[in-house]
Amino acid sequence: MVVQQHRTKFERLSADVMARWKNIPPAIASDCMNRCYVMSGRISPLSPGMKICGHARTITGMVGDNGPAHVAIGVATPGEILVIDARGHVETAVWGGI
């Protein structure tokens, strides 16, 4: 399997700014960004009240192939959230039962 990695340098938000983002509801953040770079509203927390806030590390792979996710875990840094694009495929999980 070939995994293509794109390493992009970008300015990270400070811990203070990230702490302020934690208090902003996702719908408000989405509206402020004119709904650009937001996920589908069909994606929801695994349990009520669950929240996460961090820098996204995006992953795209072929249907049924979780190899890119395994690579991303080794590359991700503390505070990053893995966002996996399953290309709309809902019959197969990209990571266990999630």
Model regions and ranges:
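A glycine-rich, hydrophobic loop/mini-helix early in the fold
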Residues: 47-95
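Ligand/cofactor pocket segment of small-molecule handling proteins
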Residues: 98
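Intrinsically disordered, low-complexity regions enriched in acidic/Ser/Thr/Pro/Gln residues
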Residues: 1-62
